[in-house]
């Protein structure tokens, strides 16, 4: 059993599968916002040590693209950063998932790309999706959205 701080109270629970959105990974190497860099690194470290972190092929592609195009990180360095995620569970996007993501986008009024993230998290049986792009606290198909940059949210410990 592990403990998680939930709005100030510790609770015991079984290890959770936690899906990371691209922005959380990008902040780990973005030097423009030190607070988000620190928070992202802490969350990823904590989840990796205490839970089961999950990504998808979409997240890895977006991470590589954002780090090389927006952050101007050298392509070989960015490739090595992607390689560092090899020990996490990686969900491979397929046609059925794309079709499901379209349904999610229609039902929940989300962008297709955000819907594909939700679908990948659902396929991996994740309890939480860590992102600053979706509505924190919202539950979509049983997955709770968590924005780690909002103080009232869950911080995994």
What is the predicted function of each stretch?
Residues 21-23, 62, 114, 133:
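Acidic active-site catalytic centers that drive phospho-/nucleotidyl reactions
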Residues 64-86:
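Glycine/small-residue-rich phosphate/adenosyl-binding loop
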Residues 115-157:
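Acidic, metal-binding active-site segment of PIN/NYN-like and related structure-specific nucleases
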Residues 1-55, 70-76, 152-157:
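Short, well-structured N-terminal submotif of metal-dependent ribonuclease cores
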